[in-house]
Amino acid sequence: MGVEGILERGYVTTSADKLINWARTGSLWPMTFGLACCAVEMMHTAAGRYDMDRNGLIFRPSPRQSDVMIVAGTLCNKMAPALRKVYDQMPEPKWVISMGSCANGGGYYHYSYSVTRGCDRIVPVDIYVPGCPPTAEALYYGILQLQNKIRRTNTIAR
């Protein structure tokens, strides 16, 4: 958030936008949409070594309880409508992280007739995490970049 001004009497002044965005970055609840081997690396970020819980990131089982969707793995054409349906069930504001080469652009299976060439053709993607599969550190870095993106957005329309 960044403290804009600390006054002599011990209180802080800031804008409502920055306060709301600070609260949102500290309580992201991702929903897993694990489709292939990238999902295993996504599970590593929730394990003891990286422990996303300490930063307020708690995996939720329902799209109605989450505000971030992590699409990890190869998205087939038959799975694309289900991805869109789950995305539509998420409350606003919502963000999407595309994890891995297959989710980003089809990856190794790019020329297959049954593979969607990137989940950004189905849902709007905010952060792309490259790799095949990307490491847990790369996903964690992508989450940090999403937090930076949220801090830069204007929450209140003028």
Curated annotation (Swiss-Prot):
SUPFAM superfamilies referenced in this protein's UniProt entry, alphabetically: HydA/Nqo6-like
Predominant location: membrane
Binding site for [4Fe-4S] cluster: 37-38, 102, 132
GO cellular component terms, A-Z: plasma membrane; respiratory chain complex I
Protein EC: 7.1.1.-
GO molecular function: 4 iron, 4 sulfur cluster binding; iron ion binding; NADH dehydrogenase (ubiquinone) activity; NADH:ubiquinone reductase (non-electrogenic) activity; quinone binding
Source superkingdom: Bacteria
Enzyme class: translocase
Keyword terms, alphabetized: 4Fe-4S, Cell inner membrane, Cell membrane, Iron, Iron-sulfur, Membrane, Metal-binding, NAD, Quinone, Translocase, Transport, Ubiquinone
Chain's role: NDH-1 shuttles electrons from NADH, via FMN and iron-sulfur (Fe-S) centers, to quinones in the respiratory chain. The immediate electron acceptor for the enzyme in this species is believed to be ubiquinone. Couples the redox reaction to proton translocation (for every two electrons transferred, four hydrogen ions are translocated across the cytoplasmic membrane), and thus conserves the redox energy in a proton gradient.
Family as reported in the entry's similarity comment: Belongs to the complex I 20 kDa subunit family.
Protein name: NADH-quinone oxidoreductase subunit B
UniProt lineage: Bacteria, Pseudomonadati, Pseudomonadota, Gammaproteobacteria, Chromatiales
